Amino acid sequence: MPPILILLTLLLPLRAGAEEIIGGHEVKPHSRPYMARVRFVKDNGKRHSCGGFLVQDYFVLTAAHCTGSSMRVILGAHNIRAKEETQQIIPVAKAIPHPAYDDKDNTSDIMLLKLESKAKRTKAVRPLKLPRPNARVKPGHVCSVAGWGRTSINATQRSSCLREAQLIIQKDKECKKYFYKYFKTMQICAGDPKKIQSTYSGDSGGPLVCNNKAYGVLTYGLNRTIGPGVFTKVVHYLPWISRNMKLL
């Protein structure tokens, strides 16, 4: 790996909305019906937003660092700035971050949101399937990540419309070179350092979709350069997800 890449692989300070879609393309409206926009207010009074995805009629999965007060979820959106008839805006009844979440090393950065009311299934609103226990995607497999992020690093505004980029699953040893706090049992690393098409700021909590299933939850990426993003490995947390959805 070129030395300059090594110098630039500093972790972004984790803040709400810390990851975004760079490059990629706008998707066909409502073709990713599982996508959610999570909005909330931080302790400093500022409004923030993250990505997320519907996994059951009452539950959305997102990143644990995407939390605050006045939480609500927008489902069925394509143009997030427009008042679309397909949109369902539902307050969050309860936020359940993983109890082992550590904001210092970004492990267990996963959270369930229980909605106050049941999501109405339509062509624009559908849950995303989770993988089976012990399922895995091999390095080299092409997956996708979607969100309402900036279209370039220098852009000052995020995209109004949902965009998607294709990412390549990286080898664990390569991920360790980029991220010294990378834990292969709990995380997946995906991207392509050679292409301007990766994750950056604004869509933390969005899904890494492989074979039409959610294999990861976006947690963080690289600072000052485009490269792989790190995702919380959904398979590792399936027992916790299942247990909490049954209890609530």
Swiss-Prot record:
GO terms under biological process: killing of cells of another organism; proteolysis
EC numbers, comma separated: 3.4.21.-
SMART domains: Tryp_SPc
Glycosylation site residues: N106, N154, N223
Disulfide bonds: C50-C66, C143-C210, C175-C189
InterPro entries: Peptidase_S1_PA, Peptidase_S1_PA_chymotrypsin, Peptidase_S1A, Trypsin_dom, TRYPSIN_HIS, TRYPSIN_SER
Active site: H65, D109, S204
Superkingdom of source: Eukaryota
Domain Peptidase S1, residue spans: 21-246
Positions of the propeptide removed during maturation: 19-20
One GO molecular-function entry: serine-type endopeptidase activity
Sorted UniProt keywords: Cytolysis, Disulfide bond, Glycoprotein, Hydrolase, Lysosome, Protease, Serine protease, Signal, Zymogen
Enzyme class: hydrolase
Chain segments annotated as coiled-coil in the UniProt record: none
Signal peptide bounds: 1-18
Family: Belongs to the peptidase S1 family. Granzyme subfamily.
Biological function: This enzyme is probably necessary for target cell lysis in cell-mediated immune responses.
Protein name (Swiss-Prot/TrEMBL): Granzyme F
Native species: Mus musculus
